[in-house]
Curated annotation (Swiss-Prot):
Segments forming domain KOW: 5-36
Keyword line: Cytoplasm, Endoplasmic reticulum, Ribonucleoprotein, Ribosomal protein
Pfam families: KOW, Ribosomal_L27e
Function: Component of the large ribosomal subunit.
Family: Belongs to the eukaryotic ribosomal protein eL27 family.
Compartments in which it is found: Cytoplasm, Cytosol; Cytoplasm; Rough endoplasmic reticulum
GO molecular function per UniProt: structural constituent of ribosome
Cross-referenced InterPro entries: KOW, Ribosomal_eL27, Ribosomal_eL27_CS, Ribosomal_eL27_KOW, Ribosomal_eL27_sf, Translation_prot_SH3-like_sf
Protein name listed in UniProt: Large ribosomal subunit protein eL27
Length: 136
């Protein structure tokens, strides 16, 4: 059987604080490592989705409603539901790694990078479905 979790694959988080949120696999670890013996992945997702905007809203209101809040997390495969979709966002692997998630200052830098990549993608209008809240 082929590998399902690949970088760029869109997944749904099933458990925890971010349950029901869409995320993208940044790096996968199929066999596990010494500190985490189970298969897991580093994911970057959207915690707070942008709100709906209409043409009769002002510039300030549109700017406020277009904000999104990202998250970075190491999650076990059992808590992820892979989809058939993928998003081709190229994250910098030197900034986004397990060491960066442990140190608060590095994590902040990584989150800023993720936010900029997602906002750039959102503003260009690519992958519109990824930036909408999952209705269930």
């Amino acid at each position: 059987m082929g590998k399902i979790m690949k970088p760029g694959k869109v997944v749904l988080v099933l458990r925890g604080k971010y349950a029901g949120r869409k995320a993208v696999v940044v790096k996968q670890q199929d066999e596990g490592v010494s500190d985490r013996t189970y298969p897991h992945a580093i994911i970057a997702g959207i915690d707070r989705y942008p709100l709906k905007v209409t043409k009769d809203m002002g510039k300030k209101k549109i700017e406020k409603r277009n904000k999104l809040k990202p998250f970075l997390k190491v999650v076990s495969y059992t808590h992820l539901l892979p989809t058939r979709y993928s998003v081709d966002v190229a994250f910098d692997k030197t900034n986004i790694n397990k060491e960066a998630l442990k140190a608060p200052s590095k994590k902040r830098k990584a989150l800023v990078e993720v936010k900029s990549k997602f906002e750039e993608r959102y503003k260009t209008g690519k992958n519109k479905w990824f930036f909408t809240k999952l209705r269930f």
